[in-house]
Amino acid sequence: MNQTAINRADVRTRFIFDDMPVRGLHVRLENVWQHIVKQKNYPAAIRRALGELLAAGVLLSGNLKNEGTLIVQVQGQGRLKMLVAEATSDRTVRATARWDETAEIADDESLGDLLGEGGVFVLTLQPKDGEPWQGVVPLEGDGIAQMLVNYMKRSEQLDTHIVLSASDEAAGGLLVQRLPEEVLDEEAWEHVSTLARTLTAEELAGLDAQHVLYRLFHETPPRVFEPETFEFSCTCSRGKVSDMLLMLGGEEVGGVVVEQGSIEVDCDFCHSKYVFDETDVNALFGEDVVGVAKGLPRHTVQ
């Protein structure tokens, strides 16, 4: 269901250095982030990792060349099963996590410990027009930021530095990157990336772009572009759930309705509930699939 939460503090800000081929993005999400964390009772360690991934998704979506959706996922076999964040070219976001809710999770646990062995990072591009693209790589690095830096260096072969942070109040991120096909003095890049490394998690989550960029680069100030506002919006719908049920097939869906009386599907992102009873399911498939599951003769329904 299309739910929206808007705040002018939920912005992404682009910047570029005129005297060196380096670009950057800053993001700070406040109301959007608070809206997301209210959907579930996230353990602190998972909440922090999800906020960092959300900020990372908004940063990376700044480089989308076509209209569409960028999806970043972290998947594992441990107590944390999945983190996922989506950011669109329309500047909407959503995010959620799945984990073993019976397991004990300490506030300071690392992402690697939560994911266990065999963790992977998945980046998916879903253009509005054209075929989707997906990249899957093993997790490399301690934390979301280092994992993304390693991924981008491997895939784009561009020097990149990323800082991410998430508190109860806000999620934030900073990305600085060499411009492609441009020559940059190693000392100049080291200077910029070293300054970026001095940014603390508290500053990133608590300060807006103007204060962050001044704090880091006041001696060589970048050119800053107009901020872009983001909002929470969930794209779930009854129609999409119907399509999913059709893919499962009438035999399986009819059997579930016989056993449970109806099918209820909850959206992981916004907690909207979609209920399909016997009448709904039969109308969806155009035949009495529930009756067939009960052993009755097959017949169509109008």
Curated annotation (Swiss-Prot):
Q: A Pfam family in this protein?
A: HSP33
Q: Where is the major localization of this protein?
A: cytoplasm
Q: Where in the cell is it found?
A: Cytoplasm
Keyword Cell division assigned = no
Regarding how it is modified after translation, the entry says: Under oxidizing conditions two disulfide bonds are formed involving the reactive cysteines. Under reducing conditions zinc is bound to the reactive cysteines and the protein is inactive.
User: InterPro entries attached here?
Assistant: Heat_shock_Hsp33, Heat_shock_Hsp33_C, Heat_shock_Hsp33_N, Hsp33_helix_hairpin_bin_dom_sf
Q: What does the record list as GO biological process? A: protein refolding
Role of this protein: Redox regulated molecular chaperone. Protects both thermally unfolding and oxidatively damaged proteins from irreversible aggregation. Plays an important role in the bacterial defense system toward oxidative stress.
Q: Which family does it belong to?
A: Belongs to the HSP33 family.
What is this protein's name?
Answer: 33 kDa chaperonin
The organism is Neisseria meningitidis serogroup A / serotype 4A (strain DSM 15465 / Z2491)
